[in-house]
């Protein structure tokens, strides 16, 4: 099979908002309309992002950036994110979400209930981008002109975000992770790791990889996106030990036997969590709250730390039994992290 080595990466909504905010601040302070801006990212890379439009008035400046999803099938591709900047009386940077930005209506998400759905990482990205321009106080207003309409086609409402889209992103970069070419890239990366290690750590996403890097050499960690099952099968033929390390939401799908965790392949996260919680003997009142939650993060707010550990141990044991069927001769290990990076369960390690 020929690998398409020119797969296009994209930018997250958070990166688009950061670029729009920086362009707006440059317009406000320098009266300059930039066609591109360069922003810092949490992973140390700098991104040059096109700016679609800049409007400058005496006391306010607005800029628009289009989200670009690369080769990912993404309904948000081409969505305009607009940021307006004006001076703030103090030296703080205040970030406000308005039209088209979703509002958080349930607990358990990264943004606090009642706030707009702008993640803490994105807020930090925006602040860092602006601080490259000025140390003055700035108020940034984020709008997504078509956000409310587009949000109806996403899963936002199911997790308690209403009225618009979420402004998210842990790295600023969107990786093409859902097609067959990507699986071939995984195969190649596994072969490279094999030259130096007899074990590999499989992490579904950026946060899992970050937390795993605190336990293992980062050079033996591979991010596999949704292709968890295929990656484990490939790795089981190459390594003596295969470690699956992830966060609860993704791994609850694997608990249910869903090895391609793309949303189109099924969900069962809360059903799986409820099932494991029953097996763990959690009280009926807690079970009711868990089953009625809109997200795993919300469900976790109803559980004590000890209950989380007990439930995730059951989840990890079941996952271990599932992946052992791929190759009985391999030492498999499952690690489940809490959302703050703490290890909730380690089975087979």
Swiss-Prot record:
Signal peptide range: none
EC numbers, comma separated: 2.1.1.195
InterPro entries: CbiD (IPR002748), CbiD_sf (IPR036074)
One Gene Ontology molecular-function label: cobalt-precorrin-5B C1-methyltransferase activity
Domain of life: Archaea
Pathway entry: Cofactor biosynthesis; adenosylcobalamin biosynthesis; cob(II)yrinate a,c-diamide from sirohydrochlorin (anaerobic route): step 6/10
GO biological process: anaerobic cobalamin biosynthetic process; methylation
Assigned keywords, A-Z: Cobalamin biosynthesis, Methyltransferase, S-adenosyl-L-methionine, Transferase
Catalytic activity, as annotated: Co-precorrin-5B + S-adenosyl-L-methionine = Co-precorrin-6A + S-adenosyl-L-homocysteine
NCBIfam families: cbiD
Family of this protein: Belongs to the CbiD family.
Protein name (record): Cobalt-precorrin-5B C(1)-methyltransferase
Primary gene name: cbiD
């Amino acid at each position: 099979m020929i690998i398409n080595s020119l797969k296009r990466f994209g930018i997250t909504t958070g990166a688009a908002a950061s670029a729009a905010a920086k362009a707006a601040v440059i317009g406000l302070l320098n009266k300059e309309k930039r066609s591109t801006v360069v922003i810092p990212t949490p992973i140390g890379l700098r991104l040059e992002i096109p700016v679609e439009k800049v409007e400058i008035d005496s006391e306010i400046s607005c800029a628009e950036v289009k989200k670009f999803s690369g080769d990912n099938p993404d309904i948000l591709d081409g969505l305009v994110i607009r940021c307006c900047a004006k001076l703030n009386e103090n030296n703080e940077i205040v970030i406000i979400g308005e039209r088209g930005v979703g509002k958080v209506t349930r607990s358990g998400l990264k943004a606090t209930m009642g706030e707009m759905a702008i993640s803490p990482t994105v807020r930090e990205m925006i602040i860092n981008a602006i601080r490259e321009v000025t140390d003055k106080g700035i108020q940034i207003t984020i709008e997504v002109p078509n956000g409310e309409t587009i949000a109806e086609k996403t899963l936002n409402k199911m997790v308690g975000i209403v009225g618009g889209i979420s402004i998210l992103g842990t790295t600023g970069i969107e990786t093409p992770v859902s097609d067959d070419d990507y699986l071939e890239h995984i195969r190649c990366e596994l072969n490279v790791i094999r030259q130096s290690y007899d074990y590999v750590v499989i992490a579904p996403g950026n946060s899992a990889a970050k937390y795993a890097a605190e336990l293992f050499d980062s050079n033996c960690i591979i991010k596999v996106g949704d292709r968890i099952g295929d990656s484990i099968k490939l790795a089981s033929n190459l390594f003596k030990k295969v470690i699956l390390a992830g966060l609860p939401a993704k791994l609850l799908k694997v608990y249910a036997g869903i090895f391609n965790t793309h949303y189109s392949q099924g969900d069962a996260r809360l059903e799986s969590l409820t099932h494991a919680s029953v097996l763990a003997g959690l009280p009926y009142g807690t079970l009711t709250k868990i089953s009625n939650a809109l997200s795993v993060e919300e469900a976790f707010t109803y559980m004590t730390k000890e209950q989380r550990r007990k439930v995730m141990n059951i989840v990890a044991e079941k996952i271990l039994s599932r992946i052992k069927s791929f190759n009985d001769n391999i030492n498999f290990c499952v690690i489940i992290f809490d959302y703050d990076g703490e290890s909730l369960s380690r089975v087979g390690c």
